[in-house]
Amino acid sequence: MTVEYQGQVYSLDLLTIKANGSDYISVENLFKQIGGVEYYSPIMKKVNLFFGGKNWVLSLDKGIAVAESGEEIPLGRSVVIQENSVYISPQFLNQLFGISTDTSSTVVTPSPSTT
């Protein structure tokens, strides 16, 4: 999968899942590879994300993302928690941090046809 941030393009092996008919990217896996920090607190129902000088808190119980500046963005279906790991839609990742991802480069093995 290719990831672009501020003109730099990275070719990364990212963990993804499919949920709600869409692809979601493991934030922990992505941030480890590009220098961000992700902290998920299941008890507090919050996810702290730090990258590129930006800090967002995803308040899962309230359904909003809050920036240090106080800006709020509704989460909608942008975040999925699976086995205590946080996955975010590529569109939401772009909205929060300006990170563009190309999920079309993800290899998907087609099922054999039964003709």
List the model feature ranges, each with a label.
Residues M1-T115:
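Primary recognition of N-terminal secretory signal peptides and signal-anchoring hydrophobic helices
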